[in-house]
From Swiss-Prot:
Keyword line: Viral release from host cell, Viral tail assembly, Virion
Top-rank taxon, per record: Viruses
S-S pairs: none
UniProt key word Manganese: no
Location in the cell: Virion
Biological process according to GO: viral tail assembly
Organism: Lactococcus phage SK1
Name of protein: Probable tape measure protein
One annotated Gene Ontology cellular component of this protein: virion component
Task performed by this protein: Probable tape measure protein. Serves as a base for tail tube protein polymerization and acts as a template for tail length determination.
């Protein structure tokens, strides 16, 4: 079933650039409106979000700018439109409507922007669902003022609308009639084929099945009938042919094929069925028309026939002739059964509507066919009689023409011929439109116009025989009158066929008729005497076949009305009659206008009532569906809440059980490690307490050794100081007198110092020996201590290793225990969720199978389910987190335990080494103490006089020297500073040098 709609595209001027510009604006506006909608929805959920309000305000301002730009462009384009042509008028209307829409939209956007500004100021999105109609009303007023300009083009617009409507209806009617005629031919072919095969009784079954198939799908009845006829002609039964055709048509539509593509598919499949073989050419033709169907057919044939796999592909198998038409038929049956073939798109529905109308016209066409055929046969007889009569007419007119040339009648005729042609053409145009409205005989008007030209040529050859001509015409009129019954039957049938469509042409016909009659009135008033004869002849018969006879009558009557007094008077009275008749015509058509207005108003009121009834009916249906849906949503919401609550309760019990179990395990492990830590800490404290007296013992030994060494050094120092004082005293007593004796004393002193050196060396060796003995003694002690510490740490390491092995074995047992539990829990939970998933899947499948529009509801439901499941897994995550924290706590306890152990070892070593250090410091302090005591026994100064430098004579140097009762030596120096030097500062510096031992 093919679509018969015809689309006419009128292009006015070069508007490509302008239309592309508007298209870009419309695209941008569409995107902005979508964004604004999302922002409004977001503000409903978060009414205090001022950022969203600012974004919406910016969006609306952008829309307002685009609307104003669009209005400006429309005004510019509107100013350049030429309203004198139908295309210009059509474009002017379109642009005016678009301009009004753009300005109304701009006013609405201004109101919305003010609302958003108020919301931003208040900080809350509380917009009332009201529209500011102030701007809209002004826009409507502007539209009213613009539409006042429609008066100047109203007539042209309505003419264009009427012409377009008549054209559309005419095209649709022609298409439906054409489809009905094609279907009639296909049915005749099917009927003849069935009769030839001896199955004429199956005609009703096959034809009705094909009509039903065409109405239910996007196929054409003609195509389905042809295909089923092909199958029947090849020997299939009526039932088999119907099944094959249904499978092919439904498969084509199921795989996206249209009614036009079905023609190519049917042609290719029919050729393969007729030839009895599957050719690559026909398969490619089928695939070209419906690629998806061709691919599916090939794959299905290969799947249903495993033996074809040896050829590798469908193409190879078809080239080898391994694929039969029977294989194709079975595969097509499978594809058709899977597809269903129901009407699925708007285009398919429209094709189905066209096919339904075509089939509705079929009974009328069948009834008209014998009547029209009979009339055509009779008209053929009339034409033969008229042809014989014309021979004598031509002969007579030739004689008449000669007489007219002689008396000057032709000169008068030539002057008025131009007016006659114009009038004749207008009247014939009216006749042509009327004939087209009732019978669709478009070609007759053109033939009539051509006949006028033929008449003008024939008049030059007209001659005599006016009486015979009139007699022949009367005979012809009598013949035509005798056939009045057949003509009435034809007219009644045609009116019954087209009654539903003539109304669309009445407006155009009235306008054209008024124009034509106005031209006719002008021609009559101009004195064209041919009109009376023309009307008289037209009252007899409108058919073009009488053109030559009419011309002859006109020629004879022209002479009568222009050359005789009687004719002139008759013509004057006829003109008066036409004037009164014209007034009646004008009144008649004026009344028709009011009549059509009343009919139209009644039709509009009736349509409004019907529409309101439909609206109320659909509103009731919608309300009923809403009530049913609310009940369904309430039921499933309650059901889901119950299920979720049960799951939450069960899961809370599971998590509570495992949380308590895990806390118990953590407490046990923590207690074990606390016990181990306490044990090791006690051992360490015992070790430190045990070795503390030993350290004190070492310290006392070192203190004793230090004291001995310090005492020895103090004795040596005392001897040296005593000897030194003796030498100084002797030197002071005899220095002035016994210079020679000094060398002897020097040798004595040298000997003494040698002895002292020997003594000091011997003393040092003794000290070294003592020290070595002490070091050996303490080395043995430290080696013993090191062995004890090493043994202690080895024991601690063994103990910790054993303890760790025990802990590991305990943990392995615990982890194995919990692994089994968790595996069991995982299986249980997996089973529960699998059951829930199966339940949800089945419930969802059933619900979507019944209600395809509940996506929003179940979206919310499953969002809730998602949150619940998320909460469940969050609880599971908390449980796992607690377990992990407990495990890490245990291991942190282990780390702290070993940290304490090694910290204790470090502290032990620090204590031991610290004891050694303190011992050495104590020994040093003891020696220093003994040395200070020995030094206190031998007071005095080690400063000696410089005998070889006499400073007394110059007033510098040592001035006095004395020894006090406590054996202290006091030396008095006379110090003078150089130029610019402070003596006090110089004395302080010298004293500081003495105190530091550097002088």
């Amino acid at each position: 079933m093919a679509s018969n709609a015809t689309f006419e595209v009128e292009i006015y001027g070069n508007t490509t650039k302008f239309e592309n510009s508007l298209k870009g604006v419309n695209t941008a506006m569409s995107g902005l409106r979508g964004e604004a909608k999302n922002l409004r929805d977001a503000l409903k959920l978060d009414p205090t979000n001022t950022d969203k309000m600012a974004q919406l305000q910016k969006n609306l301002q952008t829309q307002l700018g685009l609307s104003r730009d669009k209005a400006t462009k429309l005004k510019q384009e509107l100013s350049s439109v030429d309203k004198s042509s139908p295309a210009g008028q059509k474009k002017w209307l379109q642009l005016t409507r678009d301009l009004g829409t753009a300005e109304t939209q701009a006013n609405r956007l201004e109101g919305e922007i003010k609302q958003v500004e108020g919301a931003i100021s208040s900080g809350s999105w509380d917009i009332d669902a009201k529209m500011d109609t102030k701007g809209v009303n002004s826009g409507i007023d502007g539209m009213k003022s613009r539409f006042s300009g429609l008066r100047e083009i109203a007539v042209g617009v309505f003419r264009q609308i009427g012409s377009s409507a008549v054209s559309a209806v005419g095209n649709g009617l022609k298409g439906w009639v054409s489809d009905a005629m094609d279907t009639q031919k296909a049915m005749i072919s099917l009927q003849n084929t069935l009769k030839f095969k001896g199955n004429g009784q199956d005609f009703d079954y096959v034809s009705k099945s094909m009509q039903t198939l065409a109405k239910d799908t996007n196929a054409n009845t003609e195509d389905t009938l042809k295909l089923s006829t092909t199958f029947i002609g090849l020997g299939d039964s009526a039932k088999t042919a119907v099944g094959k055709t249904e499978a092919l048509v439904k498969a084509n539509q199921a795989f996206g094929g249209t009614g036009e593509q079905l023609k190519g598919v049917v042609q290719a499949y029919g050729q393969m069925s007729a030839s009895g073989k599957v050719s690559a050419e026909n398969i490619n033709q089928l695939t070209d028309n419906n690629t998806a169907l061709g691919s599916a057919l090939k794959s299905t044939v290969m799947e249903m026939n495993p033996a074809l796999k040896q050829y590798g592909s469908f193409a190879s198998a078809s080239e080898k002739g391994a694929i039969s038409v029977e294989m194709l038929d079975k595969a097509m049956q499978k594809l058709g059964g899977a597809g269903g073939g129901a009407v699925t798109t708007i285009g398919d529905a429209w094709d189905s509507f066209n096919e339904t109308l075509s089939l509705a016209l079929l009974p009328t066409l069948d009834a008209l066919t014998p009547i029209i055929s009979s009339i055509i046969d009779k008209m053929a007889g009339w034409g033969e009689s008229a042809g014989k009569a014309l021979d004598s007419i031509v002969k007579y007119v030739k004689e008449l023409w000669g007489a007219l040339e002689k008396n000057g009648a032709l000169s008068s005729l030539s002057k008025i011929w131009d007016g006659l042609k114009s009038t004749f053409g207008s009247v014939l145009s009216i006749i042509g439109q009327l004939i087209e409205s009732f019978a669709g005989i478009d070609s007759k008007t053109g033939e009539s116009a051509g006949s006028v030209e033929n008449v003008s040529k024939t008049i030059a050859n007209l001659a005599k025989g006016l009486a015979d001509v009139i007699k022949k015409i009367a005979d012809f009129a009598k013949k035509f009158s005798e056939s009045k019954g057949a003509i009435d039957t034809l007219k009644t049938s045609l009116v019954a066929l087209t009654a539903g469509f003539v109304a669309f042409k009445i407006g155009s016909g009235i306008i054209t008729a008024i124009s034509a009659f106005k031209k006719l009135q002008t021609a009559i008033q101009a004195g064209t005497g041919v009109m009376g004869a023309f009307n008289a002849v037209m009252a007899i018969n409108p058919f073009v076949a009488l053109g030559i006879a009419i011309a002859a009558i006109v020629a004879g009557l022209v002479y009568f009305f222009t050359q005789t007094e009687t004719g002139k008077k008759a013509w004057a009275s006829f003109v008066d009659f036409l004037k009164s008749a014209w007034d009646g015509i004008v009144s008649f058509f004026s009344g028709i206008g009011q009549w059509f207005a009343d009919i139209w108003n009644g039709a509009v009121d009736g349509a409004k009532g019907i529409w309101q009834g439909l609206v109320d009916w659909f509103s009731g249906i919608v309300q009923g569906v809403q009530n049913i849906w609310n009940g369904i949503t309430t039921f499933f919401t309650t059901l889901w809440t119950t299920v979720v609550t049960g799951i939450q309760t069960a899961w809370a019990g599971v998590t509570g059980f495992f949380t308590g179990l895990w806390d118990g395990i953590v407490n046990v492990v923590t207690t074990v490690f606390t016990t181990i830590s306490s044990l090791v800490t006690g051992a360490y404290n015992w070790f430190v307490t045990t070795f503390q007296p030993l350290i004190s013992f070492y310290k006392s030994i070192f203190g004793l050794v230090g004291s001995v060494i310090n005492l020895a050094f103090q004795l040596i120092l005392a001897i040296i100081r005593g000897a030194y004082q003796l030498v100084i005293g002797a030197w002071n007593g005899i220095s002035g007198f016994f210079g020679v004796i000094f060398n002897a004393v020097s040798s004595v002193v040298s000997t003494v110092f040698s002895a002292i050196g020997s003594f000091a060396g011997s003393a040092w060796n003794v000290l070294v020996g003592v020290w070595n003995a002490v070091a050996g003694f303490f080395g043995g002690i430290f080696n013993a201590v090191k062995g004890v510490v090493s043994s202690a740490f080895s024991a601690i390491g063994s103990f910790a290793s054993s303890a760790w092995g025990v802990v590991s074995s305990i943990w392995s047992a615990v982890s194995g225990f919990f692994s089994g539990i968790f595996n069991a829990v995982r299986s249980v939970v997996s089973g529960v969720f699998s059951a829930l998933g199966g339940f949800a899947s089945n419930a969802w499948g059933a619900i979507t199978g019944i209600f395809s529009g509940v996506a929003d509801f179940f979206s919310g439901v499953f969002d809730g389910a998602k949150n619940i499941v998320s909460g469940v897994f969050e609880a599971f995550g908390n449980f796992a987190s607690n377990a992990w924290n407990a495990i890490t706590g245990v291991f942190n306890g282990i780390g702290s335990f070993f940290s304490d152990i090694f910290g204790g070892v470090k502290n032990t070593i620090d204590s031991v080494l610290g004891g050694v250090t303190d011992t050495i410091n104590n020994i040093k302090g003891s020696i220093d103490w003994v040395a200070s005591k020995v030094g206190g026994l031998f007071k005095g100064s080690m400063v000696v006089g410089l005998t070889d430098v006499n400073l007394s004579s110059s007033g510098y140097g040592l001035s006095t020297n004395s020894v006090s009762s406590d054996n202290r030596t006091y030396n008095t120096f006379n110090v003078q500073g150089g130029a610019g030097q402070d003596v006090s500062n110089l004395a302080r510096a010298i004293r500081r040098e003495f105190e530091l031992g550097r002088a």
